[in-house]
């Protein structure tokens, strides 16, 4: 079967005619996601999302995580990633991108993350927002689909995120390389061409 928004289209398969195929697909994806109780981690930020997803999946390898394809993080890509869920996965790590206000809220409400990572606020798509503060506010839409006991993980070296310490209605943890007040300090060491990233709690 297929979703179709045009009356003049015919096919040899059943067609479900809807006003907006993307909205219909997202409604179906959200309903399908609700069939699974597995934990979901949502990852957003202005840069480094795909790397963060890859590293998170490597750390959670024993749980066989479902992940979004590299940088396929938009309204269509993440929607169809959710349709790949099945009982063989122990968790999901979803990259959530956005370029306009409201987009991240829709992704979060579909994916329903229990943990959300924001790895930084840059200037990507600033032409649609005007300021980095407004980009940050749009990134915070990731809270839209989270439960009340969800956990936020923020880059504590980013002043725009650090300013939110104690201000959000979720447990919030900060990691950093240079901010000694963060909850976890990151250090990367390279030996013989092998890099090791470690997090320590001060």
Which residue stretches match the model-derived regions?
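Acidic, Mg2+-coordinating active-site environments of NTP-dependent enzymes
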Residues: 1, 5-12, 117-202
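Short, basic phosphate-binding NTP loop
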Residues: 1-42, 51-58, 83
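General beta-strand structural signal in soluble alpha/beta enzymes
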Residues: 3-4, 17-18, 66-70, 94, ...
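Conserved beta-strand scaffold positions in the cores of enzyme catalytic domains, especially
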Residues: 15-17, 40, 65-67, 172-174
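Short, acidic/turn-prone active-site loops that include or flank metal/cofactor-
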Residues: 20-23, 28, 71-73, 120-123, ...
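A general structural signal for well-ordered alpha-helical segments in protein cores
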Residues: 25-29, 53, 75-78, 104, ...
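ATP-dependent carboxylate-amine ligase catalytic core
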Residues: 31, 35-36, 59-141, 148
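Residue-level detector of alpha-helix initiation sites
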Residues: 47-51, 98
